[in-house]
Amino acid sequence: REKEWKRAIDAALALQMSGAGAYQKEIAQFHCEIAQDELVHVHADAALQTLDKALSYDRNNVRAMMLIGDALMAKGDAEAALQAWRRVEQQSVPHVALVAQRLMDGYRAVGRAREGVHLLKTYLSEAPSIDLLEVVFKAVLELDGTLSANQLVSDELRRTPTLLGLDKLIEARLMDAPPEGRAELSLIKSLVGSYAQKLARYRCNHCGFKAKQFYWQCPGCSQWESYAPRRSEELSVMNQG
């Protein structure tokens, strides 16, 4: 696989030299593919060198910064990993949703979970996201209990009304619902949840292909970086606003 990506890099560079267009974004992604393979084989130092090359072609490549954090964490440097993951906000605020769980896990690892929650709440206020809310919700539930977790979801739903948010609110309410009201809430949850899941898709801006998970390269049209880091329903709400 590494040889394939290196050939892709050489081909893209040749196209650029011939004046056929700019391929900086693609070349950076090819380097990320190599680095990801290096991380799988526990070659963190090699991955860091490869990711530096990726950023030399595209300094705003979010994936490269996320993988730098992964490599640093693999080397046991949690503080440096946290710094790398926090830089994602400087590159693209909406993409912090993709790195939220890494950040929360990192802050737990260094014994500063509340600092992590505070940071993620700040991100949530800047770039509402159901994926980001999910991470913050679980952390608040763990640190402060169901009442605070309920309040968090309720506030977010008022600010960004989506079916996905309503589904999360019902889940939160179920946690401390009295026995006599739990059956009805569970029924509502199953009904809302079935519709919400249909909207919980990432959508390619190039070909419209929808997927349950986020892709750096669309499996439908092979375009790079064509997925917004938000679910389709959230994008619809933003466009209406």
Predicted regions: what they are:
Residues 2-5, 44, 78, 113, ...:
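TPR-repeat structural position
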Residues 14-17, 52-56, 87-90, 124-125, ...:
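Conserved structural position within tetratricopeptide repeats
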Residues 22-25, 29, 46-49, 63, ...:
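Start-of-helix register in tetratricopeptide repeats
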Residues 59, 93-94, 127-128, 160-161:
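Short coil turns that delineate tetratricopeptide repeat
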